[in-house]
C-alpha cells in the first residue's frame, strides 16, 4: 500500500466551537492544538495545514489547577534599565484580554515555524459567550465530557 499524502487543495476544513467554561486550561489547550494541526484525522499529513477552524468562547471562565492563579508569573522586559515587569495568571485572566491566556497556551503547543503560524490563524478566542461565526455553522465539541479530569 502506498503512503497517503494529503494535498492542500483536497483538505476539507470544519468549524468547531468549544466552550471553555470550567475546563482546565492545559487540557483544553492540548485538545485544541491537536485539532488545529489535524492530528485527530486518519489522513494527517505533517507538512499540510489540514486542521479545523476552532472557535473558543467563555475564555475568561477557564480553570487552573493548584494555586496557579496566584503563583504563576509571566515576566517581560520593557528594554529600559530596571524595566522588568510581571503579572500573575489571575491578573491576566481578570484583565482586559483574558483570551490571550488560552492563545498563548495553545501557541506554545503548536510547532514553531511558518506552518505553525498558519495553523494559529485558524484559532479564534472570545472572552464572552458570543462569537461572530454563526454563518459557518460550527459543530459543538464538548471538551468537559471527553474526560472527567477536563472539567473543574
UniProtKB/Swiss-Prot annotation:
One of its GO terms (biological process) is translation. One of its GO terms (cellular component) is cytosolic large ribosomal subunit. Pfam families: Ribosomal_L13. HAMAP family: Ribosomal_uL13. Belongs to the universal ribosomal protein uL13 family. This protein is one of the early assembly proteins of the 50S ribosomal subunit, although it is not seen to bind rRNA by itself. It is important during the early stages of 50S assembly. This is Large ribosomal subunit protein uL13.
